[in-house]
């Protein structure tokens, strides 16, 4: 379970470094690039996707680029209406039949051409991504992001068979969506199970472990590229993810990575999972936290340094740059 690490590892003996949401509103250069475009228009603009993605490696000097897109881009394949005002707003009925596009290359041409452009322009690997099934379903049923996803949970409890059918349809579409991105040139896949923290522990296996196992299994039947799963959960549920077949596991900041390394006999490749609020601290305090964090992690095999959630909009760019400089200056013993 180290293929994802192998794709992005640097030539020097240190952990690779990249971040969730490493390009975004905290960057003045991104704000200038976006200008007055709506977010949806920006996400459908091949040149904008290309230029925004390049900001990560160029400004931060990280070891990988992640495609600048949104998890809702998948919905183009289902012809589901959505917008950002400013957050995600989705028009969806759980009783409508989901049919995925028969021509994904045309439907996602704006994204696939950006990937082809980026592969030529980048000197680091490009990561494609998508939401995992439960997370995508939660956005659909609640009409966007939500703290507690009440409509999702009510539908799940009241109509478990229909919810399972929705997860199956989303899985099928996601496989096609990601397969096309890999064929366009992306080197690896990051899956995001961002809504999973809402689930009671006893439902985690059914709605997170099982659907992600199916998704990863189907992906590996048609592509050879490595897959990482980011999942919001606690230590107990995180251990359940070792059965899903991912090449790398990426917990959010709720999981104690040191504990995982001490208690799991073969922890495999892990990435994460520093709390992104630490990037808001004065630089000396931030760097002190990073050095403490890496004391035990930097020598772990196949470890990738990353954040435990996306970089916050109010983060000073210079703090992230200082963090990368600190992290890329270390060496393993």
Swiss-Prot record:
Q: Does the keyword Cytoplasm apply?
A: yes
Q: Which InterPro entries match?
A: UROD/MetE-like_sf (IPR038071), Uroporphyrinogen_deCO2ase_HemE (IPR006361), Uroporphyrinogen_deCOase (IPR000257)
GO terms for cellular component: cytosol
Annotated site location: Transition state stabilizer: 70
Q: What class of enzyme is it?
A: lyase
Q: How does it assemble?
A: Homodimer.
Lineage, highest ranks first: Bacteria, Pseudomonadati, Chlamydiota, Chlamydiia, Chlamydiales
The protein in question is named: Uroporphyrinogen decarboxylase
